[in-house]
Amino acid sequence: MTQDKILILDFGSQVTQLIARRVREAHVYCELHSFDMPLDEIKAFNPKGIILSGGPNSVYESDYQADTGIFDLGIPVLGICYGMQFMAHHLGGEVQPGNQREFGYAQVKTIDSELTRGIQDGEPNTLDVWMSHGDKVSKLPDGFAVIGNTPSCPIAMMENAEKQFYGIQFHPEVTHTKQGRALLNRFVLDICGAQPGWTMPNYIEEAVAKIREQVGSDEVILGLSGGVDSSVAAALIHRAIGDQLTCVFVDHGLLRLNESKMVMDMFARNLGVKVIHVDAEGQFMAKLAGVTDPEKKRKIIGAEFIEVFDAEEKKLTNAKWLAQGTIYPDVIESAGAKTKKAHAIKSHHNVGGLPENMKLKLLEPLRDLFKDEVRELGVALGLPREMVYRHPFPGPGLGVRILGEVKKEYADLLRQADDIFIQELRNTTDENGTSWYDLTSQAFAVFLPVKSVGVMGDGRTYDYVIALRAVITSDFMTAHWAELPYSLLGKVSNRIINEVKGINRVVYDVSGKPPATIEWE
């Protein structure tokens, strides 16, 4: 099935991924590529329209130039912020540094146009938007007209109606721009004429066919962690090739309570997936003995996982493919780190950490999907919603939620405390009937390797401390601590102290990010 596509050229904005998310939310497929994507590749991609992202640079910097042949393809182009300046500069207009940076909320007065018709906030012909720019367009290219302005930016929006070129000096992709989604939908659906055929049933059908074509009769191995990405990848691949898939589930002793059983029940028993369960708790605990530095713990856990997985992989002599749960943000971030051009700077282990001499071919069926799309896919494939929508869990597991040295005793105490906290979050609702688990973005318990004095019954206790952490965030870059009801915190504390022998004090973390990080290590 062929589907209409939108191409986004990324000039380095921190929020370019949000453009892609908004387009996908309109059920139109899109891809995000570096601004220097060759013109022949753009033609081969055959987009219905092109969006030029924002970016931190100046149009006068030669290192940040897209191929201007995009303006000769006869398709609509939308320039956002820097993208608008790039469009104006290369089509004969002028761009100059602004007398003052415009950052934050602004009101744009609009003039009726194909892009803005019927879209407004409050007052007629007014848009509440989010600006973030220094340079600005000072002279329009020939054939363009102003369709929006602010007091400090006379050319805040421009259009060439004949060629369907549009420029906007604000960010429609962020939630602060109230009608941003409507503007992007107008461009994608109405101006570009893209048909909204990007749906999960269509994706499953295409992905299954692609996996079958790619793999043929070969066998595939996948490291199953119990996390969302690897679980959904396993379910999708199994839907496509059945028993040709073998999953290796490494239990390092640092999983959540009953997680090992849950994974085995779900995949091996309910879905009929071949799963090799490796109990490696002793091996991991031995390697972690005496280690207190968080980064060293992470490296040890990562190295041991690879060692255990490799040992199992060598036994599966017929496996030709290694499957991974790589998702689209991983691909984008790794591309940015390699080229130094895109907006992100971290390399993801799924994409950048494979051994150079790896003999297995790589299968990444989720690499075109964002996280929320992966969750939607998981539900469509029959995975339990409760599992698919679980809060994030770190790769090293409880190893980075036990401060200092990791011991089996500590992990067992933490597992029980964490499970009680999550149970009560799920069971307690706000006035609208929404559970506090769903109201928070991430919640967990932390084991503190310090003892405090307590009194239980007629006796004195000297036991360990548990810290509770719950945050609310939209992007995990910044976060607010969740203002949980005192009654909920009190119930969690009472249950942990009474039910988990070895804990006599519970504290709640009220630090935001920044200055604190979400995880304690």
Swiss-Prot record:
Domain (Glutamine amidotransferase type-1) ranges: 5-197
Residue span, GMPS ATP-PPase domain: 198-390
Disulfide-bonded cysteines: none
GO MF terms, alphabetically ordered: ATP binding; GMP synthase activity
Active site (record annotation): 81 (nucleophile), 171, 173
Binding site for ATP: 225-231
UniProt keyword list: ATP-binding, Glutamine amidotransferase, GMP biosynthesis, Ligase, Nucleotide-binding, Purine biosynthesis
GO BP of this protein: GMP biosynthetic process
Pathway annotation: Purine metabolism; GMP biosynthesis; GMP from XMP (L-Gln route): step 1/1
Pfam family, one: NAD_synthase
CC per GO annotation: cytosol
EC number per UniProt: 6.3.5.2
Keyword Metal-binding on entry: no
Catalysed reactions, as listed in the record: XMP + L-glutamine + ATP + H2O = GMP + L-glutamate + AMP + diphosphate + 2 H(+)
Quaternary assembly: Homodimer.
Protein purpose: Catalyzes the synthesis of GMP from XMP.
Cross-referenced NCBIfam families: guaA_Cterm, guaA_Nterm, PRK00074.1
Protein name: GMP synthase [glutamine-hydrolyzing]
Organism: Neisseria meningitidis serogroup B (strain ATCC BAA-335 / MC58)
Gene name per UniProt: guaA
